[in-house]
Amino acid sequence: GAVTPIGNNVETFWKNVKEGKNGIGSITKFDTTDYKVKIAAEVKDFSAKELMDFKAAKRMETFSQYAVAAAKDAGFNIEEEDPYRCGVIIGSGVGSLQQVEKACQTIETKGPGRVNLLLVPMMISNMAAGNVSIHFGLKGKSINVVTACATGTNCIGDALRAIQYGDAEVMFAGGTESCICPTAVAGFTALTALTTVQDPDRASIPFDKERGGFVLGEGAGVVVLEELEHAKARGAHIYAEIGGYGATCDAHHVT
């Protein structure tokens, strides 16, 4: 399943990929007048209330909503499964910086006693996996991985191992992010990681000699991994088989 800047489900996303649609545009989430970076890849026309009840949506930050939406878009029928044999490994590099920003503003203007009582469960990045588990009633592993840009791949690899080790038969795996906000844009700009090019068609050009950084984006992607015989037994449409997974680092530089 997918929630992306060029489509809020796999069908729309893939159609727009093939048509070469560009999801980058001017930042609409906050005033960028004082910022060098003024563009990002924002998700458009997303409504959590169409996917879950209002109360549940209200208790989730956007990155968690995206994760639930992408998991739902994956189209797996959980009702016929043992919930204790189904788990979730969905990561988020940041969680919700927006909640941190709001809390800081509240403390400054109204005092610490007025901070949102749901600040922590809306802020911490493991709530993406937690909310997917709650939404679908999955009672196996519920784990968050934080490895920056490698998070989603890391989650898929760890989900594979959970199945190989016999901890689960079905795993929802992927990544989610929604941090297009003043703090994130300012921070990544200070790191000189973001491009300052304002033309959306020339902003994200990683293999071009004129490249100058990446573009901040948001969205979620979730895949369903199954033990092979389990998938065959239920007549699943198998898109691919994962043969193995490994992880290393260069132990050299923070980026």
PLM features: what roles do these ranges have?
Residues 32-42, 95-99, 178-204, 222, ...:
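Active-site-adjacent elements of ketosynthase-type condensing enzymes
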Residues 12-14, 18-147, 176-185:
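Conserved beta-ketoacyl condensing-enzyme motif
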Residues 2-8, 54-72, 115-124, 142-157, ...:
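Active-site pocket-shaping loop/turn-to-helix segments
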Residues 85-89, 169-173, 204, 239:
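Short glycine-aspartate micro-motif
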Residues 18-25, 199-255:
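Condensing-enzyme catalytic core mediating Claisen C-C bond formation in acyl metabolism
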Residues 84, 166, 186, 236-240:
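Structured loop/turn residues at beta-strand edges in well-structured enzyme cores
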Residues 67-77, 125-177, 215-236:
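Active-site-proximal alpha-helical scaffold in enzymes
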